[in-house]
């Protein structure tokens, strides 16, 4: 690619972000295929996710999906924010607020809560408060990752 050509799809640099900045992602519908593939990949053989007959006797109606799948999809939805600029995922707390089901469409609402330089000036730490919201406007998952991100060259 030519040096003077602008690259589409690159993430944000830590020094372009400020506390209070807010972002939203596009939506993604979770499908039966997503559930089956994730459960098989992670070997989450809990009958809650694998046995539709047993589901009839449980308190939650519908095909519930693991919160780990919801989290993984949320991170994928946020990827454009960090594409090529994210360096490390350092930590997070995670709180499951409610069930997510096959057929639900989720998006992520993200608010920057912390931005600071590291001792190496070309890197920074960014913490966001992320809420995963379904099509009914219900927050189903909340987490606050701290990430190391590249800085914009001066």
Whereabouts are the PLM-identified features?
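HotDog/MaoC-like acyl-thioester-processing domains
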Residues: 1-18, 100-154
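Conserved hydrophobic positions within beta-strands
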Residues: 27, 74, 96, 110-112
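Hot-dog-fold acyl-thioester-processing enzymes
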Residues: 1-91, 152-154
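Short, conserved aromatic-histidine micro-motifs
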Residues: 89-100
